[in-house]
Amino acid sequence: MKPGRKSLPKKNRASNITEKMPTTSTEAQSSSSKNQDRCRSFSQELGVDDEPEEQQAPVATPKQTKKAQKTAKTTEEVKSPRKSARKSELKKPEPEEKAKEPRKSASKRKSSSLMNKDEPSTSTEAPSADVPGTSEASDEASEIQEAPENPNSALAIKKRLMGGGESSKSAPTKNPPKARKSNVKKPEKEAEALAPPEPPAEPQEAAETPAPEPLVPEKKPKIEDAPTTSSPKKSTPTSAPPTRASARVSKPNRLYADGSFNTEILGRTRITEQNPVKEAQAKESTPELADLPLPAGRRKSTAAPRAPPAPKPIPVINGVLRGYIPSVKVPLAEYEVDGEIINLNEGVNETMDTILAKVCEDGVEKHEDIDPKVVKAKKLAKIDYTKRLKLQVKKLDIQMRIKIPSTPEELGKRKRQAPKTDDFYWSAQSRTKLKGSSKEREETPAFDEESPIGGDEKRQQKARESISHLFDAEMDASIKEAKKYSVSFDKYIKPKITGALKHAKIKLMSRKRQSAEPDDFYYHELLVDQVSPSNSNVENVDVDVDIEETDDKVDPTEFEISEEGVIGIRDEAVDMAEQIALVIPRPTKHDGSPMSMDEIQMRAMEHVESRTKCLDGSLEIVLNQLGHEMAPPTRGVEEQGCQWHTVTSANAQALKNLYTIANNCTEDAITWTHQFMIENLEVHMLASYLSILKYAKRLNSSRFGYVISSTDQLDPEWTQVTSLLKSFVYKRHTEPGTEVLNNTIPYHRMTDTVFLLVPPTLTFGDHQRAPPRHHARIFRWLQSIGHQDSEFISFDEDIDATCSVAEYLSDVIVERICDKVRQKNKYRPNCNVVLVGYGASTYLIHRAANLVEGISAIISIGFPVMTSLGRRGTADDEILLTYCPTLFIVGAEGRRFNNEAITELRTSMISPSGLVVVGHSNDMILVPTSMLLRLGISQTVVFRMVLEKILDFLNLEPVRQQEFADLVPIELNNVFDLDSALLKSDKALSGLAFASSTHSASSSAAPSPVGASGRRATVTGAGSEDIAKRRKESIILSQQIAAPSISGPPPPAPSPRTEDRFLAFQNLVASTITTGDDMPRRASMGASPRVIERGDFRDHRPPPPPPLPILQNPVATPMSQQPPLPSPAPPPPRGPVDPASISLI
């Protein structure tokens, strides 16, 4: 390798190729002279002759900005002194070369120097003859110029990039490629050896350069363009524009200066290749910011940063921090020290306030609710939030409504004058005619709003209205058709009724009237035995199925006995058991055969008694489930699904009762039993256990979730098994055999009824997500059938969780029910409000019915008529005064059901009531498992029949067609509200003081009697004329009783013990007693009397004996002079009597 070639810097040898990239002809012509000179300098370095015409025009380099110039200057100042010396040495032949070429302007020299400064390496000037190795480099250049090659060709660039220059030096060819740039930086010693000696005159030349800026310590002289030989200007050959003009062409040394290069020059896809060696070199050569000389205006100060200002202390005003409400502090007494009295409250409390605020953060957050402004703001925020929710609901209602476009009815342009939307159907000639006619019509004046409407206009308006009405009717019909449920309940239940009669001799339900009394409002029985008729149901003798006949025939597949149906139910459980068996193999004997159940139980006997006892109970439940699943099928596929669901639910309830935690030993036994059964049970038994576990998870989610997760962290195998169990158990299951049942629910069929559902388990707070109970299914069905505002009644958030008094919680929920009823009547005045209770909550809804108005009906499911204090429906029971129709649904086998008590309750109520008796069920309307297996149905089917009876009761005309004015609680008199003037009388406490004064008898109307229960009857049914007539009769009767007879003993005084005078005594007492609160109320009741429809409070005493004749002396008193015998007392009234007056009879 020649020394001259080696001494030349590598970056000068790898000059900017991007400057030689072809551009458009306009650029080449605009800067031809400048680019030609630059091209000559570059070609000398590369050893390429630029004389041939095939050379493409170089790319014009854009001018640099001042910012780029400063950057280049700053970068050059950091370079080594040897490089600067070398630059000055290379600068010596500059005047000779300048004499050959035309003189350049100052601006061109400035631009060329800026472009050369932008390059990362030194100038590309050829070395002079004084420097050793210069002659050899010129000889080499002359050899290379003999066979020129286009340096911008793809082959030359590729050779330079791939390092073909080193191989060409040993064997020179026509076009020796350029040496590849070395990625490794040379050491300093090698660079010093190869560099030429420094001349002594370098500092003087450097001093002759223009003075740099005052703040910059050293500045290099401007480096002019490289010397080139003058050559005549050649016309640039026109060539096709390049396929792609990259944005990187404008940057001179972008290809080689960076650590990445653009290979798109070679015609490849654009890829950016990273060179880690060059990146490391760039990091090493890049000076630190602290070493760079910066100008005075932009130099950063090296002083330490200022500390942040200290936060301002919180002001303490009168011992209390601002915005701080202090906690309660005990007042401290003053004490004396050395004759000086010290007040501790001022010093200690101030210090405590500051400590609490800074350390404990007490006061501001914990006591914000004490501030009345904060409390008021919170209430206002809740009110605003409620209003926003209501507005949002209204907005959604408006959006969900079907908007029917209708024609406008305003006067003006008619529809035929509107622009045509189907112009493309018309020809060009017709279209022009329409446009011309429309223009003429637009010029005509429109109708005046005050002008009378013509006959044609009226007819058109009527036509538009009729069209819109027809459209509305069609839309309503389509909506109703879409809302229809797909399967009728009669079609679904008919085969089940037939199967129950065939297998169990039990009639599930009937549509016919089942009451023996014609006056009974509504009475039905479900699941009735057909063996012997009962007294209350005369139609049980009929064996015919009275469900409405349908044209569709019963599907014969429902009664097909198929073993595949039973196997298909537990397929999922069997698959999961097989997956668990793959992870944890089943135990085997020494010979490899599987262990029997007896041997597995013998292994369990080694453990403590609590574990073995829990295992025995669990195995008994699993064997019961397995026995039912392995039994041969005897019913249809749907009945098999119902039976499997019934058995699995019962076994899940038993497992839930067994896995109830009592103490630490029991908890350990439960988790060990679960782990033992998962690890040792066979696949078919494990599938049965998994089915039970899945159903039990719904009964007590938290408990069984803990049991399943107890094996999670034992080892990796058990972790995998636990994840499999969770994926199976947590998956929501559907009850088999009831897929068609869900299609019989008439969703949104009673949109004019709002159901308020009061569950028997009332929860609040974190316990809102209680596990589903037996009542949840009926309540969800009713909520989906009724109006969208139907909801469950629960406790408010304001309830104190520590309070457990039943009376207090009952009053709270009753008040909540009343508030909901008032709210629904206010916002939904056209809807009927129906209260639904289940179990104990039925008492609460009946209590609320006596306090609030607007309840259309009450549904009492599982009403307990027998209580610990006696039966319901006695004379002083408020349930008798229920003003709305009531439906009682009771279980025939319940402990709190009594047929006579419920019959007397219904008869004594003043409003109509219905009764549905579910046979073979308990108080919660739950049918035993054995009975469900006989019938081939599940508990869900029983609830569906109960729902059908509820809908039948609500669709009765007396229930649907009630006036809102009649739905008002009956008002009772207050017996303690007496007239104070009555107590000031002297004869107030005398026996017949009121009877002796005719003035007091005629001064006021006769009130109703007051009973021992504290009520006074208010229903009289008499007008003002009847009151005056009865008052007159009572005065005459009292005068006859008070006047002594002429002869004979006087008649006995009236008393309640005299049976023949009982009615007269009652009339006398009723006509003489007066109170201050009776006149206005009785006067108002007389104008619009309220008729009592039903009642059973009759006189249950035996009929009175006939009156005995009065024995007198016939001689002393002739027959003509004897007073006439009083007429016999009329029979006791058989009609309805007010319940409040029953205590006086």
Curated annotation (Swiss-Prot):
Extent of Low complexity compositional bias: 226-248, 999-1013
Compositional bias, Polar residues, is annotated for 14-34
Keywords on record? Developmental protein
| Comp. bias (Basic residues) | 1-13
Q: Name one GO cellular component term.
A: NSL complex
Q: Name one GO biological process term.
A: positive regulation of transcription by RNA polymerase II
- Composition bias of kind Basic and acidic residues appears in 73-104, 216-225, 455-464, 1091-1102
Pfam families referenced in this protein's UniProt entry, alphabetically: KANSL3_1st (PF23154)
Any idea what this protein is called? Protein sumv-2
The scientific name of the source species is Caenorhabditis elegans
